[in-house]
Amino acid sequence: LDRSSAASDVYKRQQVLNSIDSESTNPIPVIYQSGYLTIKGYDEEFGMYRLGFPNREVEEGFVRFLLPYYANVNKVESPFEIQKFVREVRSGDYSSFFRRLQSFFADTTYEVIRDQELHYENVLFIVFKLVGFYAKVEYHTSEGRIDLVLQTDKFIYIMEFKLNGTAEEALQQINDKHYALPFEMDERKLFKIGVNFSAETRNIEKWIVEEK
């Protein structure tokens, strides 16, 4: 999954948009010709088309379509699972949220996961991208770690995910780097959550929470 193609507009030349063959590894022409992407602009100087999702409904539908291919959830259950995620973060039930997230990684065979770290990041990206249609989400990745800020009307979640480390280290980083400082005067309840991913079990192993 190229997360940039699911996160923002992309630029492609016309010959790329019209070229689909069995040897091509570029998903953009297929996505474009399937109707998920539309032309939003054209750069005459470089002959590049700017592509993007025509509206929120189409973008959400596309990301929902991806979910069963990356997580342990079937196509029928997928929309309902995301609804449960959203309800849990809106109600402050982070334990149920993470148990549900664990189930998304369960029973995924080692053969399916060619790049374990990339697979983990892709699943998290898709889940939080979908949750982001209903709550404010800021998501960043960098060298084996993911930091996330998720906001609802009543709650703020600051999460640090360690792909090679401990939940304690993840929570310590939130505190050491003062990730919660911008929300110091916010009246909403704040959760600082450190999470680690186990290479042995290929799943979320532990999460630690500090509440404000």
Where are these regions (language model features)?
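Mg2+/Mn2+-dependent nuclease catalytic core
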Residues: 163-180
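Acidic-basic catalytic patches of nuclease active cores, encompassing PD-(D/E)XK
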Residues: 103-136
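Short, amphipathic alpha-helical interaction segments positioned at domain boundaries
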Residues: 52-83
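Conserved catalytic cores of phosphodiester-cleaving nucleases, focusing on short active-site segments
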Residues: 124, 148-163, 177
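Single conserved hydrophobic/aromatic residue that forms the stacking wall/gate
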Residues: 1-7, 11
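A short, conserved structural fragment
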Residues: 34-42
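Active-site metal-binding core of divalent-cation-utilizing nuclease and nuclease-like domains
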Residues: 127-153
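Domain-level recognition of nuclease-like catalytic cores that cleave nucleotide substrates
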Residues: 182, 186-212
